[in-house]
């Protein structure tokens, strides 16, 4: 039995690809036809890839693995953050900062700075500072929360990343490839399948399509590990990957 039915894929519009002028020839094997200037994705192949990808996610989750959710395009931001929070997984929905994976040690210093500022404000000690400094520190805190708040509990490199639109998130995919971190992706007809380890060929623009795939992944994580905000923290204590990998690659 498949994790997702053909009916669900059709109703969510997963089969609608990009305009034929926007495509990657390497994606050809997942295309069924072209109609009115739009590529139609072969949902039979999508179903096979869903089973393969979701089997991997289920197995990884049962072993305590951590998946970093990435979706910075407008249609994906809210959905990706919601499912990541529901499962306790780290996420990036604002902008991918170069080095988030390959220079993770430096990224941790930004997270530590955010924690320091949070303590300053929450303790009330911020009121001991001059008004101009309070405003400056408040802006810094807000900026750090926006960019690294979703990964603040990520104490080591993730075991995999899930990406909505790997073409847009090309830097995240490149960093994961460089470190040997598996990439799971909802990928449209403009994507390069060769840089994706577990591809779900489908519409990565439509909200219903993004929601169907991302929510089902969330369900898998909850079912495998019970869900909750502590899921990622537990996973951080397990697995073989550490931030030392990033340092080795940088060296």
From Swiss-Prot:
A biological process term (GO) from this entry: translation
Statement: the UniProt record of this protein carries the keyword Manganese: no
One GO term describing the cellular component: cytosolic small ribosomal subunit
Cited InterPro entries: Ribosomal_uS2 (IPR001865), Ribosomal_uS2_bac/mit/plastid (IPR005706), Ribosomal_uS2_CS (IPR018130), Ribosomal_uS2_flav_dom_sf (IPR023591)
GO molecular function terms attached to this record: structural constituent of ribosome
Pfam families associated with the record: Ribosomal_S2 (PF00318)
Keywords per UniProt: Ribonucleoprotein, Ribosomal protein
UniProt xrefs under NCBIfam families: rpsB_bact
Protein family: Belongs to the universal ribosomal protein uS2 family.
Protein name: Small ribosomal subunit protein uS2
Gene name in the database record: rpsB
């Amino acid at each position: 039995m498949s994790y997702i039915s053909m009916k669900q894929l059709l109703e969510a519009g997963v089969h609608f690809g990009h305009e034929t002028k926007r495509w990657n020839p390497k994606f050809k094997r997942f295309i069924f036809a072209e109609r009115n200037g739009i590529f139609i994705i072969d949902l039979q192949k999508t179903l096979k890839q869903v089973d393969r990808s979701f089997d991997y996610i289920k197995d990884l989750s049962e072993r305590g693995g951590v998946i970093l959710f990435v979706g910075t395009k407008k249609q994906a931001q809210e959905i990706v953050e919601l499912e990541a929070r529901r499962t306790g997984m780290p996420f990036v929905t604002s902008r991918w900062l170069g080095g988030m994976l390959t220079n993770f040690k430096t990224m941790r210093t930004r997270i530590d700075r955010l924690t320091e500022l949070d303590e300053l404000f929450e303790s009330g000690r911020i009121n001991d500072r001059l008004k101009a400094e309070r405003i400056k520190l408040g802006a810094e805190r807000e900026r750090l929360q926006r960019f690294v708040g979703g990964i603040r509990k990520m104490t080591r490199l993730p075991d995999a990343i899930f990406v909505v639109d790997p073409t847009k998130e090309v830097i995240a995919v490149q960093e994961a490839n460089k470190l040997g971190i598996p990439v799971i992706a909802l990928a449209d007809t403009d994507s390069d399948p060769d840089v994706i380890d577990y591809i779900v060929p489908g519409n990565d623009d439509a909200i219903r399509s993004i929601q169907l795939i991302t929510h089902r992944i969330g369900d898998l994580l909850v079912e495998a590990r019970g869900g909750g905000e502590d899921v990622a923290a537990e996973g951080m204590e397990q697995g073989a990957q550490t931030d030392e990998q990033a340092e080795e690659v940088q060296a």
